[in-house]
Curated annotation (Swiss-Prot):
It comes from the Bacteria. This is Large-conductance mechanosensitive channel. Channel that opens in response to stretch forces in the membrane lipid bilayer. May participate in the regulation of osmotic pressure changes within the cell. Homopentamer. The gene is mscL. It comes from Chloroflexus aurantiacus (strain ATCC 29366 / DSM 635 / J-10-fl). It is found in: Cell membrane. Its main location: membrane. SUPFAM superfamilies: Gated mechanosensitive channel. Keywords: Cell membrane, Ion channel, Ion transport, Membrane, Transmembrane, Transmembrane helix, Transport. PANTHER family: LARGE-CONDUCTANCE MECHANOSENSITIVE CHANNEL, MECHANOSENSITIVE CHANNEL MSCL.
């Protein structure tokens, strides 16, 4: 059983998947930082304030609170700001993955080989073509 497990783990696909998961986790942290530390402040600059979507919420029980944590402690809350941040993160990750896949596909695709020009006919072939043409004209 240990031997089978070792063979399973040593297959390329499993190792590639593990590397992909680890890189994906690290990439998620980078995207979160990009959204929270760069994109949201730029949006805040454009709309004239701080674009902190994490505190955008609608209390469902009618309570009032200034932060999402306070509102969640007081009762049910629609935290649409957190959802908006997750959507922005997803769109950024999807775009970056699309660009990576697109680049890899372009690198993989080989330009179509141009077929070589047909070789010049040999003197014998030219002579045979002339004989054929003469016979065709005669009837």
């Amino acid at each position: 059983m240990i031997k089978e497990f070792r063979e399973f783990i040593s297959r390329g696909n499993v190792i590639d998947l593990a590397v992909g998961v680890i890189v994906g986790a690290a990439f998620t942290a980078i995207i979160n930082s990009l959204v929270n530390d760069i994109i949201n402040p730029l949006i805040g600059l454009l709309v004239g304030g701080r674009a902190d979507f994490s505190n955008y919420f609608i209390p469902l029980a009618g309570q009032t609170a200034t932060t999402l944590a306070e509102a969640q402690a007081a009762g049910p809350v629609l935290a649409y700001g957190s959802f908006l941040t997750a959507v922005i993160n997803f769109l950024l990750i999807a775009f970056v993955v699309f660009m990576i896949v697109r680049t890899v596909n372009r690198m993989r695709s080989k330009p179509e080989a141009v077929p070589p020009a047909p070789p010049e006919p040999t003197p014998s072939e030219r002579l045979l073509a002339e004989i054929r043409d003469l016979l065709a004209r005669q009837g």
